[in-house]
């Protein structure tokens, strides 16, 4: 009987979990409002084109009574792009939000398909000021959530984007390469470079090892490529990390970091802990997102904190 069962990836949150997650969402939301972020709420349902140009198997879709194809939102940043493009909201502006997002995972992976997020978007400000503001607000939000042990992990979208843009290979091969990079599959990457040789062979083969302390990672990466776009991205990362060294306790690089959203255009970052594999925070720059909605390019950066992941990390230490 389906009356008493839940769809794949959906879960009831009872008692302790429900209360603690509510308190985390509330505390972060109040903190961000006090820091000058403008609270925004967007619909759970949108036209599917807001999130993707094509129908995605990772999104939940349904038709309304007029036959329009809708999506349960898989992220909130795309909705902010729509708001900026379709309203008279003036920039520069800083938004904060919280709410549910939905993304379909295959049943055998055992992952949740519904998550609660809290996050921010900083639009139209000077790039370096916006980056610092975003990262420091993320640090403050993590503190407000009760999380103590974590590290920031940085990368740059132009690194992998440049590799993929210059590989003249089928889409199926690009998807295969994405999987190898994501899984840090050393054997798979070696075999791939033999099947599809390119100027990026050395860099592709070493991607699983371009992780850890920033100075060593940057030094090694520069020895593997002469491509100017990638070298510029490495310089951007180096300059930023030098500025952030005092503000953020533990910083690492992972140049094989796959963009959590397709619209990232520069700096990307995630926050991880030791207890669970999922990122607590994912964020980055997305200056070109607004062009999808017919608006001009704007400097923009944001992050989303996964409250479900934070709860998994801290619940053992919370008395109920």
From Swiss-Prot:
What the entry lists under Pfam families is as follows:
tRNA-synt_His
A molecular function (GO) held by this record is:
histidine-tRNA ligase activity
Q: Per the annotation, which location comes first and is thus the protein's main one?
A: cytoplasm
Where's it found, cell-wise?
Answer: Cytoplasm
Q: Name one GO biological process term.
A: L-histidine biosynthetic process
- Top-rank taxon: Bacteria
Q: Name one GO cellular component term.
A: cytoplasm
Question: What are the UniProt keywords, alphabetically?
Answer: Amino-acid biosynthesis, Cytoplasm, Histidine biosynthesis
Q: Quick one: which pathway?
A: Amino-acid biosynthesis; L-histidine biosynthesis; L-histidine from 5-phospho-alpha-D-ribose 1-diphosphate: step 1/9
**What is the purpose of this protein?**
Required for the first step of histidine biosynthesis. May allow the feedback regulation of ATP phosphoribosyltransferase activity by histidine.
Remarks, miscellaneous? This function is generally fulfilled by the C-terminal part of HisG, which is missing in some bacteria such as this one.
How it assembles, according to the record, is: Heteromultimer composed of HisG and HisZ subunits.
Give the family this protein belongs to, as stated in its UniProt record: Belongs to the class-II aminoacyl-tRNA synthetase family. HisZ subfamily.
Q: PANTHER family of this UniProt entry?
A: ATP PHOSPHORIBOSYLTRANSFERASE REGULATORY SUBUNIT, HISTIDYL-TRNA SYNTHETASE
Q: What is this protein called?
A: ATP phosphoribosyltransferase regulatory subunit
**Species, as recorded:** Streptococcus mutans serotype c (strain ATCC 700610 / UA159)
């Amino acid at each position: 009987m389906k009356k008493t069962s839940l769809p794949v990836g959906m879960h009831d949150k009872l008692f302790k979990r429900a209360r603690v997650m509510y308190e985390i969402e509330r505390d972060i939301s109040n903190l961000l409002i006090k820091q000058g972020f403008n609270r925004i709420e967007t619909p759970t349902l949108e036209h599917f084109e807001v999130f993707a140009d094509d129908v995605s198997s990772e999104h939940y879709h349904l038709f309304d009574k007029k036959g329009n194809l809708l999506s349960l939102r898989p992220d909130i940043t795309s909705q902010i792009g729509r708001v900026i493009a379709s309203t008279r909201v003036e920039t520069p502006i800083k938004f904060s939000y919280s709410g549910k997002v939905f993304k379909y995972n295959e049943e055998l992976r055992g992952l949740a398909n519904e998550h609660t997020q809290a996050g921010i978007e900083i639009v139209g400000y000077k790039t370096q000021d916006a980056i610092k503001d975003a990262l420091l607000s993320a640090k403050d939000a993590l503190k407000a959530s009760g999380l103590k042990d974590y590290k920031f992990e940085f990368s740059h979208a132009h690194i992998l984007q440049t590799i993929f843009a210059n590989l003249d290979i089928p889409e199926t091969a690009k998807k295969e390469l994405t999987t190898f990079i994501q899984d840090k599959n050393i054997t798979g990457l070696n075999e791939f470079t033999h099947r599809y040789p390119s100027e990026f062979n050395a860099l592709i083969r070493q991607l699983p090892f371009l992780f850890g302390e920033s100075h060593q990672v940057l030094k090694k990466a520069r020895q593997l490529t002469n491509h100017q776009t990638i070298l510029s991205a490495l310089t951007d990362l180096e300059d930023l990390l030098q500025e952030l060294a005092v503000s953020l306790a533990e910083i690492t690089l992972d140049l094989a970091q796959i963009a959590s959203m397709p619209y990232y255009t520069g700096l990307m970052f995630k926050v991880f802990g030791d207890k669970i594999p999922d990122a607590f925070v994912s964020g980055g720059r997305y200056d070109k997102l607004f062009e999808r909605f017919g608006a001009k390019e704007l400097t923009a950066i944001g992050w989303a904190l996964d409250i479900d992941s934070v709860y998994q990390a801290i619940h053992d230490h919370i008395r109920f």
